[in-house]
């Protein structure tokens, strides 16, 4: 039987406010345990929550960016459950009336563009953190510690429709969402610090069946690689279970990266288990049109708009435009290079950034902001290819030297110091061709007999004689003339 995977994601995006969503405590990461939790966070008697305006504005900005409906009135609700790192005994979230409803997010899986519908985005507070490995009692018995620094940190939970059909598609969506929230400046995107965490709802069904299978939820995956592996494992587990005559249980599972498997955490609750009801300590969040308009006026150019502009203004393919707008820094870098080149050469800039620059950044695990070759310096290098000073092959060597800081990272200085200027004198190139032809009569005859590989062999020997500095285009043209 052929099976189809059905995936929906719930992403907890930590909003980049200086203080918590309902208290004035700092959200700074890495402070000593329990030093950033005040009376509200600790749920001390008499303390009352006060809504953080900055968190609401970031939610509005996200809603506008994805084309969702920003609710003029949304309500905070108490989500009731017991956990040691939840001092109040409930989490303040949103249930029936979220701050954002609907919206879409487009992204590429390989070179295929996909669009996923969003169900909602709602504001809520984070819980604290339980630490199980660092503590023990005097008797040596294991113990757990509670750090409430994270309790009350503002989150925007973004929920998709169950429309994704592969782990690769889910990861591509998550990457696109991560890029968007960082682009908007509403989240720092630091997955190691827990600023961007995904819950994956996974089920399987026979191909062609309309009804969904029983889903499981994989909690708090904070790596794109782990997200893909967790979904793949869980889908295989469910398929094998069903084919062996078993039944999938609705439950919450955790992904164990060391064993590359998911394991049961607890039975999956339904909404009624949490006994949601409006929080009596918080008034409804009322968002007037003037507030929405003010947020819209301050919006940056969105990735989708910039992609369309790159396609229209620079003639880039859709895939290239998408790759160059994964971050604002990358988009700005490309545009700075493209503007410094002659008209019609933007594709060459895109090729270099998506090729040599991206490969070197990945190898060194750096972001474009940390690239030692500036946009202006790269533009100078590409201009030397365009004006015939060096070949594309030599340019790669020059780029490596620029990256390493040779001659101050100046392309012209490196070309001069290494004597790399391309030979474009037709007389000098012609003389080299004559020497190679005279030394290789057998290869010449093979070419004249129709073997194209022979031509490539001759070109290679000419370039070797020129130490790679002959203009490749001129070599090809003059060689064809001499061979007749």
UniProtKB/Swiss-Prot annotation:
Record's keyword terms, sorted: ATP-binding, Ligase, Nucleotide-binding, Protein biosynthesis
Reaction it catalyzes: L-glutamyl-tRNA(Gln) + L-glutamine + ATP + H2O = L-glutaminyl-tRNA(Gln) + L-glutamate + ADP + phosphate + H(+); L-aspartyl-tRNA(Asn) + L-glutamine + ATP + H2O = L-asparaginyl-tRNA(Asn) + L-glutamate + ADP + phosphate + 2 H(+)
Superkingdom per UniProt: Bacteria
Name of one Pfam family that matches: GatB_Yqey
Claim: ATP-binding is one of the keywords in the record: yes
The enzyme's E.C. designation: 6.3.5.-
InterPro entries: Asn/Gln-tRNA_amidoTrfase_suB/E (IPR017959), Asn/Gln-tRNA_Trfase_suB/E_cat (IPR006075), Asn/Gln_amidotransferase (IPR018027), Asn/Gln_tRNA_amidoTrase-B-like (IPR003789), GatB (IPR004413), GatB_C_1 (IPR042114), GatB_Yqey_C_2 (IPR023168), Gln-tRNA_amidoTrfase_suB_CS (IPR017958)
GO BP terms, alphabetized: glutaminyl-tRNAGln biosynthesis via transamidation; translation
Keyword Protein biosynthesis attached: yes
Annotated GO MF terms: asparaginyl-tRNA synthase (glutamine-hydrolyzing) activity; ATP binding; glutaminyl-tRNA synthase (glutamine-hydrolyzing) activity
Disulfide bonds: none
Biological role: Allows the formation of correctly charged Asn-tRNA(Asn) or Gln-tRNA(Gln) through the transamidation of misacylated Asp-tRNA(Asn) or Glu-tRNA(Gln) in organisms which lack either or both of asparaginyl-tRNA or glutaminyl-tRNA synthetases. The reaction takes place in the presence of glutamine and ATP through an activated phospho-Asp-tRNA(Asn) or phospho-Glu-tRNA(Gln).
Similarity remark: Belongs to the GatB/GatE family. GatB subfamily.
Subunit structure: Heterotrimer of A, B and C subunits.
Protein name: Aspartyl/glutamyl-tRNA(Asn/Gln) amidotransferase subunit B
Species in which this protein is naturally found: Bordetella parapertussis (strain 12822 / ATCC BAA-587 / NCTC 13253)
């Amino acid at each position: 039987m052929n099976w189809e995977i059905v995936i929906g994601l719930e992403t907890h995006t930590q909003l980049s406010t200086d203080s918590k969503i309902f208290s004035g405590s700092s959200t700074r990461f890495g402070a000593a345990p329990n030093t950033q939790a005040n009376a509200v966070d600790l749920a001390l008697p008499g303390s009352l929550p006060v809504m953080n305006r900055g968190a609401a504005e970031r939610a509005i900005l996200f809603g506008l960016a994805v084309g969702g409906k920003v609710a003029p009135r949304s309500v905070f609700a108490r989500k009731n459950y017991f956990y040691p790192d939840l001092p109040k005994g409930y989490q303040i979230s949103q249930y029936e009336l979220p701050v954002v409803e609907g919206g879409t997010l487009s992204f590429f899986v390989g070179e295929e563009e996909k669009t996923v519908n969003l169900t909602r985005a709602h504001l809520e507070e984070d819980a604290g953190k339980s630490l199980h490995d660092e503590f023990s009692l005097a008797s040596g018995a294991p113990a757990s510690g509670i750090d409430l620094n994270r309790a009350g940190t503002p989150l925007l939970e973004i929920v998709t429709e169950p429309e994704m059909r592969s782990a690769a598609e889910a990861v591509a969506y998550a990457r696109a969402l991560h890029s968007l929230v960082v682009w908007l400046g509403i989240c720092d995107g630091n997955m190691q610090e827990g600023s961007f965490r995904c819950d994956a709802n996974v089920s399987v069904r026979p191909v062609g069946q309309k009804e969904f299978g029983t889903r499981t939820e994989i909690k708090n995956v904070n790596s794109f690689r782990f997200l893909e592996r967790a979904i793949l494992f869980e889908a295989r587990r469910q398929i094998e279970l069903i084919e062996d005559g078993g039944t999938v249980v609705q439950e919450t599972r955790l992904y164990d990266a060391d064993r590359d498997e998911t394991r049961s955490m607890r039975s999956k609750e339904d909404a009624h288990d949490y006994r949601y009801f409006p929080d009596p300590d918080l008034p409804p969040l009322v968002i007037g049109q003037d507030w929405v308009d003010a947020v819209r006026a301050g919006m940056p150019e969105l990735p989708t708009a910039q992609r369309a502009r790159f396609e229209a203004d620079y003639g880039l393919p859709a895939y290239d435009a998408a790759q160059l707008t994964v971050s604002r820094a990358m988009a700005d870098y490309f545009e700075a290079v493209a503007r410094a080149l002659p008209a019609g050469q933007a594709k060459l800039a895109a090729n270099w950034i998506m090729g040599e620059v991206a490969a070197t950044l990945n190898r060194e695990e750096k972001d474009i902001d940390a690239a030692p070759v500036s946009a202006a310096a790269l533009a100078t290098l590409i201009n030397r290819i365009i004006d015939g000073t060096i070949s594309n092959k030599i340019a790669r060597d020059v780029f490596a030297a620029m990256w390493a800081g040779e001659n101050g990272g100046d392309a012209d200085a490196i070309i001069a110091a290494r004597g790399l200027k391309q030979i474009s004198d037709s007389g000098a190139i012609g003389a080299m061709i004559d020497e190679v032809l005279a030394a290789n009569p057998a290869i010449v005859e093979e070419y004249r007999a129709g073997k194209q590989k022979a031509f490539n062999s001759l070109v290679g020997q000419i370039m070797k004689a020129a130490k790679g500095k002959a203009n490749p285009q001129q070599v090809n043209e003059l060689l064809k003339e001499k061979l007749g």
